[in-house]
């Protein structure tokens, strides 16, 4: 049957540092990196991540064997590349529960055996089944839990292990290793001398007898090359942050990964027209408005918020329609851009003459910004040395108005805003903090400002209501759901909501399926479902049962599902394209669900697009779905055959997001016959009809 809310994961990572490397079969190299498994040759450049089935993003080992390519994650998950060269199959997860790291680059293979050096043991794995054969924790007189393996190597029929106590060796019968009952006997290992498991020259790089002197091959006058592979007239030179190819006397730097270059992402913000902007802690921003990421742009003079971005859970990136962007760098004021952040417009700096509060001379602290309710500019809350924070209004032409000292706390956290119910005033929510910490005690201030459009562009004389925080803690993120008239928020340890006409924050009574977590971020989708990011447990989608804010049912998403990293620093929902974006230290994840799109204007007089059907002709089973798009969320969709018989109907949750996706099967679960089919979309008095062709 048709799949409701078709799901699709994408991961974007920076594939560095390189932890291990091995030559590919004909050309190129396989690389184990902190951003996934990378394949790089003269033409192609792919990074494989959990979205391709890996279930982990940080890999410490890779081997290329006659049985295929195998990758080993930081904590010992083992996966094999599928024959289609597209996805991966996880063979073994058993080691990950031990939470012991693999020694980077120390994964070897012989016959049908993979040998993995962990920090406290050596593991032997059956390559065919992926099952662990056994692990040894002592070799000779060396306890590996005390003197862990540093390097391993296979030379002929012997396995060598180097520790801080020297190198030991053991002769192995790799074909009959399962029957080697003495493998666990430490006495079968012997100390050896004169064996070098890493004999590269640390001072120079030599290819075909020629010493290469190119600067990219050296760091501090020492060779940056850790692996060297000669492949049919080409030599690949690889280091932790280096990929180069030497061919016909010419060295080519292949290090840069063009598709995604934003490292240390900590914040994402959906673009109203569709897409996302991401910010990094080292002061760069990058946008994706469709199928690719733009090159990162420096936010301000090379400054970044650095660890403050993580420590204080900064939410300082906001985006208006038509590409206007505001960003705050810790201590450095506000920075306005247009063209999705690629055209700097104006800097509002703390050492200039303006009304911003400062916590120190020439030093501003802002933890949150948001879009003004009428989309005329941005709002922010600035901390003040006097212990009374202020609220700022910044227009797109860089005018700033400050309501100084309107809060009672030293520090202000995230900020959110909406129009009052009579559409005259602004309601502004500011999370208060007794200290800068994301774990601080605090509450929530609710301000009612007259719209600046009625006050000559100035933010003046607010009414303030202060309420107790959830469990007395400061909120670290907030999301306004105007359709359902509720504000959702998270503290580091809790989830709460406050209805617009209430004066207190409440906890949902039941959140079935949600484990205790440290929360980092929150957003609400067009259906009123709540999404929360966590510090270590991935993302949860909390569905309201029977429309209740108090009864929620959780769906949990982790790296097993396709998330790049279970440590989620921020989330934001693109309601135009139906995508939730998630920020991680090693990249960005996106997750498409058809029900994440906002569809309330579809099939109305203000709709920007008419109902459409694609692809036509439609080939069922060809890894695609027939889509009937731009329909009302209250619509009913019926599909008929040429004889007028009803084949399928869609209603309710099946049309959430304004799109029906049909796999080409009838009510009986079988493929429909080739031919002409008709669709009818009914939404109140509006009816849209059309036809399409099915072919096999």
Predicted regions and their residues:
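Glycine-centered coil/turn sites that cap beta-strands in beta-rich domains
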Residues: 604-639, 650-652, 659-662
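C-terminal tail/sorting-segment detector
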Residues: 676-696
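Short, glycine-anchored, charge-dense loop/turn motifs used at functional sites
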Residues: 636-647, 677-679
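Surface-exposed loops/turns
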Residues: 565, 620, 633, 656, ...
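Extracytoplasmic/periplasmic beta-strand context in beta-sandwich domains
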Residues: 389, 442, 624, 660, ...
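Glycine-centered tight-turn motifs at strand-turn-strand junctions
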Residues: 646-672, 684-688
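Carboxylate-rich, polar loop motifs that coordinate divalent cations or form catalytic acidic clusters
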Residues: 1-610, 646
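Residue-level structural signal for beta-strand termini and adjacent loop
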Residues: 138, 257, 652-653, 677, ...
């Amino acid at each position: 049957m048709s799949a409701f809310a078709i799901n699709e994961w994408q991961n974007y990572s920076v594939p560095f540092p390189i932890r291990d490397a091995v030559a590919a079969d004909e050309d190129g190299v396989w690389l184990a990196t902190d951003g996934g498994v990378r394949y790089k040759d003269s033409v192609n450049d792919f990074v494989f991540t959990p979205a391709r089935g890996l279930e982990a993003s940080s890999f410490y080992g890779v081997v290329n064997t006659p049985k295929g390519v195998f990758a080993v994650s930081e904590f010992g998950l083992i996966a094999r590349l599928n024959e289609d060269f597209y996805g991966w199959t996880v063979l073994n997860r058993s080691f990950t529960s031990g939470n012991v790291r693999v020694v980077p680059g120390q994964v070897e293979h012989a016959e049908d055996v993979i040998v993995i050096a962990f920090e406290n043991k050596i593991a032997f794995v059956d390559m065919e089944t992926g099952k662990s054969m056994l692990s040894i924790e002592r070799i000779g007189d060396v306890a590996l839990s005390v003197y862990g393996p540093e390097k391993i190597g296979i030379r002929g029929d012997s396995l060598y292990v180097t520790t801080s106590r020297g190198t030991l060796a053991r002769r192995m019968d790799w074909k009959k290793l399962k029957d080697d009952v003495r493998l666990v006997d430490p006495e079968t290992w012997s100390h050896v001398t004169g064996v070098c498991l890493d004999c590269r020259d640390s001072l120079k790089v030599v290819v075909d007898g020629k010493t290469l002197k190119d600067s990219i091959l050296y760091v501090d006058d020492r060779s940056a090359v850790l692996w060297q592979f000669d492949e049919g007239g080409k030599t690949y030179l690889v280091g932790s942050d280096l990929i180069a190819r030497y061919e016909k006397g010419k060295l080519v730097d292949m290090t840069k990964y063009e598709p995604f270059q934003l490292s240390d992402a900590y914040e994402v913000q959906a673009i109203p027209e569709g897409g996302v902007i991401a910010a990094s802690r080292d002061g760069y921003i990058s946008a994706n408005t469709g199928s690719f990421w733009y090159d990162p742009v420096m936010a301000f003079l090379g400054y970044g918020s650095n660890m403050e971005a993580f420590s204080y859970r900064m939410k300082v990136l906001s985006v208006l329609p038509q590409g206007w962007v505001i960003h705050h760098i810790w201590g450095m004021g506000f920075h306005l851009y247009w063209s999705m952040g690629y055209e700097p417009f104006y800097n509002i700096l703390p050492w200039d003459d303006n009304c911003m509060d400062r916590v120190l001379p020439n030093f501003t602290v802002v933890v949150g910004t948001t879009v003004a309710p009428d989309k005329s500019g941005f709002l922010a809350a600035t901390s003040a040395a006097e212990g009374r924070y202020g609220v700022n209004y910044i227009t797109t032409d860089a005018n700033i108005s400050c309501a100084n000292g309107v809060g009672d706390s030293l520090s202000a956290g995230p900020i959110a805003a909406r129009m009052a119910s009579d559409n005259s005033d602004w309601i502004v929510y500011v999370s208060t903090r007794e200290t800068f910490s994301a774990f601080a005690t605090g509450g929530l201030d609710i301000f009612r400002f007259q719209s600046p459009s009625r006050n000559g562009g100035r933010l003046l004389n607010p009414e303030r209501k202060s309420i107790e925080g959830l469990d007395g803690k400061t909120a670290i993120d907030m999301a306004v759901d105007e359709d359902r008239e509720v504000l959702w928020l998270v503290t580091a340890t809790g989830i709460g909501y406050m209805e617009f006409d209430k004066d207190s924050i409440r906890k949902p009574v039941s959140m079935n399926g949600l484990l205790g977590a440290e929360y980092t971020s929150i957003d609400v989708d067009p259906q009123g479902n709540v999404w929360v990011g966590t510090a270590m447990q991935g993302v949860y989608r909390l569905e309201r049962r029977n429309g209740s804010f108090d009864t929620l049912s959780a769906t949990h998403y982790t790296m097993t599902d396709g998330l790049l990293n279970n440590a989620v620093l921020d989330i934001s929902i693109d309601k135009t394209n139906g995508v939730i974006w998630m920020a991680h230290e090693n990249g960005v994840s996106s997750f498409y669900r058809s029900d994440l799109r906002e569809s309330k204007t579809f099939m109305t007089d203000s709709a920007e697009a008419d109902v459409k059907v694609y692809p036509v002709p439609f080939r069922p089973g060809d890894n695609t779905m027939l889509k009937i798009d731009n329909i009302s969320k209250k619509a009913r969709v019926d599909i008929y055959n040429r004889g007028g018989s009803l084949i399928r109907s869609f209603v309710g949750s099946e049309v959430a997001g304004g799109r029906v996706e049909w796999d080409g099967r009838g009510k009986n679960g079988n493929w429909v016959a080739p031919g002409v089919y008709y669709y009818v979309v009914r939404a109140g008095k509006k009816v849209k009809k059309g036809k399409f062709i099915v072919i096999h």
